[in-house]
């Protein structure tokens, strides 16, 4: 009754020390995107990509889209300024952090009253743009998100990252000896 499931525990470690795949840091994911102030928007890349991941994300995307900084009230700007990269913005809400260039991203969530600052930019005093959220999730720059900021945040927060979906699909294909289920 029910299903029996087992897996090779070594299969879990696919990235990082001791593997052939390196982690993608925040800097490697979004460090080439133009710096913005609250409410600003950019449509052009200002520098070339400097990581393999950035090159892959930019493929087939001649223009930059969805790179508009959220507007913030003064108290939010003050809170972000006071927070060191890698630290939580609030003691009560540990999932709202200011990202650090050298770290990995925590899970993005879709809900919340103030969606613009679940994750604050490591250097700029603002929340992430939709393009930055997409990049971190492995959506290429030619991927179009529709709707306003909140709707786009819900889409990125609820999404399965494309590179994760690909890895799962390849694992299923490999485990089933190429037979699709």
Question: Over which residues does each language-model region extend?
Answer:
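Hydrophobic, well-ordered secondary-structure elements that form the walls
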Residues: 108, 129, 136, 157, ...
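Internal helical hairpin/lid segments
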Residues: 69-118
């Amino acid at each position: 009754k029910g299903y029996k499931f087992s897996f090779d525990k070594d299969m879990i470690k696919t990235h990082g020390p001791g593997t052939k795949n390196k982690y993608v840091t925040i800097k490697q994911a979004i460090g080439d995107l133009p710096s913005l102030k609250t409410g600003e928007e950019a449509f052009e890349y200002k520098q070339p990509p400097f990581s393999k991941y950035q090159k892959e994300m930019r493929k087939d995307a001649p223009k930059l889209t969805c790179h508009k900084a959220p507007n913030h009230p003064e108290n939010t700007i003050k809170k972000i300024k006071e927070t060191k990269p890698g630290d939580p913005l609030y003691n009560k809400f540990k999932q709202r952090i200011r990202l650090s260039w050298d770290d990995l991203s925590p899970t993005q969530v879709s809900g919340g009253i103030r969606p613009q600052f679940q994750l604050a930019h490591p250097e700029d005093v603002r929340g992430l743009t939709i393009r930055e959220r997409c990049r971190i999730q492995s959506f290429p720059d030619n991927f179009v998100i529709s709707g306003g900021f909140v709707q786009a945040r819900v889409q990125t927060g609820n999404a399965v990252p494309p590179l994760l979906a690909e890895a799962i699909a390849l694992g299923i294909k490999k485990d089933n000896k190429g037979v699709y289920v």
